[in-house]
C-alpha cells in the first residue's frame, strides 16, 4: 500500500512538473510571438541605378537630396526621376523602373507587402515571384492596381493625374476604382480616365515598345544571365551586380565565396562608404562601390591569403537583410580613443553572431544569423542570452577574428560618423593594440542628427511639382502609418533616441524547421549550394542551425510561349479572359482578395477605394463591346517579338510641360 501511494505521488509530481514546463514554454512562446510584431522588416528597397537627375526624400523629412546609389529605402521614402532621367530600384528579385518625370512613394514596404504610390509618370515592374502571402499594389490618382502573378507590367499616369494606362506584357493584375473592378491580363493595355465619381476605361492592344521599354528589357536580360544566381538566392537584394565586379571561387574552409575584382590598396569591407540613420534599424552602412549592397547587408567577410572574400550564407528563399553586419569598437558611452572621440567597427567573420542594436525578438536574432552564415544554433542562443537577456552593453567574452586582421578595423571621428561623411577620407589613426583591447559593443551610443537621416545626398532644387507631391491616390490596402521626422521621434523618446530599451527579454526561441541543404533546383531554376561543414565537432554538427524559410512560393506557369529572346509572350489561352466588372475571370492559382480594413493612422495622400458595386446592364454591355473589339484586333498566333503583340498600337505620348 505504501509503495502504491509512493508511486502515485511520483506520477502526480511528474505530471505537475510537465504541465508547469509546458505552461512556461507556452507563455514564453506567446511573449516571443508578441515581441515579433515589433520586429523590423527583413527586406528593404535599394536604389541601384540612376541616370540623369534623381531626387530622394527620406520618410518623415521635408528636404529633397540627390539619390545616392545603394541607399536602402523603406516605407515612407520618396523618389523622383526628373525630365530625361531614369532610375531602377530593387526589392529582392523584383525590379521597379522609373521613367522621365516620375514620382513614387513607398506607402508600405515590409515582409509581405509592397505598396507604391505613383502620382505621375511611367513605372515598369518586373515581378519574378509571388508567394501566397505576398501583396503588391500600385496606387494611382484614380485606380489601385494589384499584381496577382509574376510578370511584367507598366503603368503610365498623366501629368494631371486624370488618366492611368495599365499594360500587361505577361502576368495578370486586378484594377479597383470608381466602384468597379477589372482584370488586366497578358496582351492587354487598359486606359482608365476620370475619378471615383465617374471612371471610364478603354481596352486595347499592347503598344509598340518605346525607349523606356527597351531599356527595361535590357536590364531584365542582364539579370536573367546573372551567374551569381547559382550561389545566392535571387531574393538577396543586390545579387545582380556581383558578376560584373567580382568572381566566384571555392575557398577551403568556407566553400564558394565571392571576391571583388579590383580594389585599391588599403581596401577593407565597410571602409569606403558612410553611415546613415534609417529607422527602425538605426545606423546603416551605405557602400560607395556600385556592387556594394549584397556583400554589406548579407553574409560575412573572411580575410584569406592577403585578400578579403565575401562568404554568403546558406541559400534560402529570402535571407534577412541587416543594416550592417559589423561589430563596433569603443562605441559605448564614456569611451575615447587616445586620438580623440571616435567610432570604430570591423566586419563579422563567418560563424560569428550578429547582435542587432535595435529592438528585436529572439526569433529575429536567430533568423538574421542563420540565413546569413552557417552558425551553431546554441552559439546564437548563448550570445543572445549574454548580450540581450542579461543586458550587457559590451561583449568581452567573444574573440572576433577580423578585429585582429591588420587593417581590418575602421575608425572615424564622432563628427564624421554622425554627419554621413566618407569614412575612407576621415580615418583616425589608432594603435593596433588599442583597437584589440577596446570594448566591443553591439550598438553605437551616438545620437543621430538630421544629416544622419538625409545622408550623403546633396540638397537639390529638382523635385516633383507641388501638385504631384500633394496629389492623393486611391488604395485598396491601408498603408503604413506616416513616419515622423527625426526631431519628432527624439522628442517622443525624451530626447535620446538611442537610449530607449532596445530589446526586452523574451522566451525561448522556436525551433526552426529543418531544411535540406543538398544542391537542388529551386523555384528560380538555379542550383542551391549548401555551405561546407567546417567543424569536426559532433555536437556542432548536431546543433547546426537550419534556416527558417518563408513558405515555399507557389509556382505560377507563365502564360504564353517562350519567344526567341526568352521572354514569355501573351498566350492565346488568355483571349477569353475578359475584364468583367465585379465578376472578373480570376487566375487559375490566385484570386484577388480585398484586404480586411483595420483601423490605422490615416495617411494624408491616400483615399480608400470605394466599395465595388454591381455593374448595371448598360455597363456590362459596354464591357462586352470593348472586349470584343480588343479580341478581334488581337493576332491569331502568339507574337514572335519579345513582349508585345504584333500590329500593336503606338504608345500615346504624354503632353509636355
PLM region spans:
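Sec/Tat signal peptide C-region and signal peptidase I cleavage site
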Residues: 22-28
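Bacterial N-terminal signal peptides
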Residues: 11-21
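Flexible, surface-exposed loop/linker segments and immediately adjacent secondary-structure boundaries
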Residues: 28-181, 185-189, 225, 347
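Solvent-exposed, flexible loop/coil residues
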Residues: 5, 68-71, 77, 108-110, ...
Amino acid at each position: 500500500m505504501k509503495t502504491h501511494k509512493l508511486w502515485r505521488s511520483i506520477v502526480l509530481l511528474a505530471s505537475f512538473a510537465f504541465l508547469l514546463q509546458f505552461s512556461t514554454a507556452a507563455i514564453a512562446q506567446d511573449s516571443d510571438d508578441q515581441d515579433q510584431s515589433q520586429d523590423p522588416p527583413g527586406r528593404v528597397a535599394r536604389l541601384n541605378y540612376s541616370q540623369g537627375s534623381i531626387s530622394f526624400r527620406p520618410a518623415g523629412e521635408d528636404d529633397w537630396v540627390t539619390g545616392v546609389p545603394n541607399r536602402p529605402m523603406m516605407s515612407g521614402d520618396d523618389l523622383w526621376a526628373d525630365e530625361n532621367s531614369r532610375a531602377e530600384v530593387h526589392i529582392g528579385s523584383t525590379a521597379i523602373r522609373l521613367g522621365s518625370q516620375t514620382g513614387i512613394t513607398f506607402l508600405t514596404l515590409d515582409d509581405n507587402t509592397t505598396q507604391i504610390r505613383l502620382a505621375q509618370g511611367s513605372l515598369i515592374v518586373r515581378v519574378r515571384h509571388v508567394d501566397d502571402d505576398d501583396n503588391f499594389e500600385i496606387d494611382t490618382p484614380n485606380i489601385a492596381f494589384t499584381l496577382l502573378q509574376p510578370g511584367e507590367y507598366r503603368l503610365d499616369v498623366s501629368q494631371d493625374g486624370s488618366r492611368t494606362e495599365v499594360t500587361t506584357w505577361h502576368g495578370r493584375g486586378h484594377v479597383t476604382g470608381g466602384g468597379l473592378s477589372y482584370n488586366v491580363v497578358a496582351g492587354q493595355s487598359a486606359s482608365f480616365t476620370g475619378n471615383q465619381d465617374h471612371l471610364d476605361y478603354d481596352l486595347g492592344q499592347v503598344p509598340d515598345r518605346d525607349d523606356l521599354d527597351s531599356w527595361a528589357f535590357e536590364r531584365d536580360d542582364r539579370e536573367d544571365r546573372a551567374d551569381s544566381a547559382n550561389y545566392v538566392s535571387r531574393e538577396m537584394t543586390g545579387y545582380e551586380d556581383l558578376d560584373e565586379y567580382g568572381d566566384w571561387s571555392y575557398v577551403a574552409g568556407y566553400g564558394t565565396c565571392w571576391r571583388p575584382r579590383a580594389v585599391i590598396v588599403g581596401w577593407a569591407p565597410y571602409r569606403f562608404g558612410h553611415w546613415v540613420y534609417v529607422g527602425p534599424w538605426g545606423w546603416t552602412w551605405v557602400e560607395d562601390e556600385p556592387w556594394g549592397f549584397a556583400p554589406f547587408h548579407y553574409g560575412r567577410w573572411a580575410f584569406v591569403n592577403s585578400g578579403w572574400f565575401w562568404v554568403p550564407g546558406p541559400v534560402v528563399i529570402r535571407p534577412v537583410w541587416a543594416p550592417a553586419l559589423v561589430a563596433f569598437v569603443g562605441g559605448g558611452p564614456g569611451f575615447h580613443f587616445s586620438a580623440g572621440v571616435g567610432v570604430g567597427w570591423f566586419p563579422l567573420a563567418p560563424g560569428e553572431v550578429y547582435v542587432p542594436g535595435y529592438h528585436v525578438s529572439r526569433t529575429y536574432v536567430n533568423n538574421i544569423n542563420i540565413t546569413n552564415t552557417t552558425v551553431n544554433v546554441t552559439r546564437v542562443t548563448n550570445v543572445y542570452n549574454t548580450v540581450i537577456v542579461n543586458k550587457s552593453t559590451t561583449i568581452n567574452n567573444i574573440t572576433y577574428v577580423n578585429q585582429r586582421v591588420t587593417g581590418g578595423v575602421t575608425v572615424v571621428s564622432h563628427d564624421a560618423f554622425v554627419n554621413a561623411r566618407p569614412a575612407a577620407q576621415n580615418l583616425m589613426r589608432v594603435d593596433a593594440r588599442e583597437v584589440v583591447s577596446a570594448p566591443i559593443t553591439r550598438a553605437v551610443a551616438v545620437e543621430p542628427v538630421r544629416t544622419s537621416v538625409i545622408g550623403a545626398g546633396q540638397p537639390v532644387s529638382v523635385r516633383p511639382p507641388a501638385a504631384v507631391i500633394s496629389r492623393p491616390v486611391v488604395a485598396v490596402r491601408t498603408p503604413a502609418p506616416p513616419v515622423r521626422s527625426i526631431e519628432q521621434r527624439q522628442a517622443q523618446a525624451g530626447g535620446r533616441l538611442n537610449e530607449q530599451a532596445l530589446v526586452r527579454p523574451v522566451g525561448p526561441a522556436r525551433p526552426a524547421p529543418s531544411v535540406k541543404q543538398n544542391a537542388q533546383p529551386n523555384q528560380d531554376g538555379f542550383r542551391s549550394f549548401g555551405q561546407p561543414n567546417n567543424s569536426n565537432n559532433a555536437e556542432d554538427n548536431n546543433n547546426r542551425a537550419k534556416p527558417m524559410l518563408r513558405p515555399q512560393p507557389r509556382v505560377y506557369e507563365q502564360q504564353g510561349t517562350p519567344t526567341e529572346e526568352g521572354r514569355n509572350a501573351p498566350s492565346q489561352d488568355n483571349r477569353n479572359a475578359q475584364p468583367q466588372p465585379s465578376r472578373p475571370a480570376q487566375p487559375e492559382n490566385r484570386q484577388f482578395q480585398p484586404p480586411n480594413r483595420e483601423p490605422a493612422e490615416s495617411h494624408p495622400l491616400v483615399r480608400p477605394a470605394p466599395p465595388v458595386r454591381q455593374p448595371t446592364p448598360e455597363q456590362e454591355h459596354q464591357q462586352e463591346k470593348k472586349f470584343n473589339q480588343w479580341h478581334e484586333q488581337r493576332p491569331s498566333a502568339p507574337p514572335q517579338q519579345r513582349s508585345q503583340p504584333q500590329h500593336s498600337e503606338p504608345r500615346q505620348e504624354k503632353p509636355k510641360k
